[in-house]
Amino acid sequence: GATTYGGDAKNPAGGDLADATDKADGATSFSYDLRIFLDTSFTGEDLLRTRLRSGNIADVYAGNGVVGLWSQEYGNSTGNDLTVDRLFYQFPVGDEFTFTGGPLVRQDDMLAVWPAAYPAAMTVDFFTYAGAPGAYNLTAGAGAGVIWSKDDFNVSASYISSNGNGSDPDTGGIATDGAGSNGTVQLSYAPEQWGVAVAYNYGSTDNNDLGLYSGNGTPLANKLQANGVTNSAALSAWWMPEETGFIPSVSAGWGINSTNSSADGNGITYDGSVLESSTSQSWYVGLEWADAFLEGNALGFAVGQPTFVTSIDKKNSSDDFVADGNYAFELFYNFQVTDNISVTPAVHYFSRPLGGDKDSTVTDGDSFNSFGGMIKTTFVF
């Protein structure tokens, strides 16, 4: 893939930010992500999963460029080493309950449903969070969860410590000050063709694998959420037509996050003032046409706003609005070449990916945007 940049924003040291970013991140790159699933069942109803992973995506597509929103869902670098990416055990109890636990389990492994029908082919990471990267933050670590399901109604509850492999309570452990705790509750109703879901998530300050990162939020949203305990909520809905054709599936989601400053009271300084709290939001709408033009292929389009700060609460001051918004667009077509091989060309556009951070040392201009294209080839066997 390759990216380009435009706008009249200037570097603090002078010169166009777009030109400087083109020079830093504008080359065409070619990289890989490998995932190996080792699944075992002892009863035919349980699952012991080990997932191995390797990759060398360490550039702009891993969120490491000036525009972090270019990060892909598969953006991962292990230095070409093969590592354990997942290790958990899942088993049913009766007809209504499912329990999951392990030393390396991810939040979505313990959800009854993923609240979206979009996308069939994952590319830019933001569009894979059902519009709410705060609530559905995909934290991984040591954890356990339970799912209750009955007549299309589902309740999911889980806890994860992203630092659960450590024994020092200041930096690790389970349910300690340094655990990096992440707790999630999801309520959903999901018949065959549609569904709705609401979710709540609690994320602690010390979670090193929690919530926002450069690939699903603006720089300011990332900076403020890293400073304290975050409570997040999400509302999602999706619908799929009974027959493929002209009418697409529709997925929509919205998320809101409230971050309180660290308990030490030092807070974080923004625009010359110490903050007590901040609020951020995100949303998206995704349309997907299954069997578009040819059976087995898919056409997808999405628009949304990656997590952006909407208000801040300064000490000894009233709430202040922050113009941090940015629009993201995605268009892809997934060719199913064979049962095992698919090719997905995609284009993306970000209208204002650096948001409105007044303290930013990167830009001091009026506008900055980014456009790019990529081709993803997937082999499944």
Kindly give the residue locations of the regions a language model identified:
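Short glycine/acidic-rich loop motifs that flank beta-strands on beta-rich extracellular proteins
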Residues: N207-D209
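Transmembrane alpha-helix entry/boundary detector in multi-pass membrane proteins
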Residues: I268-V274
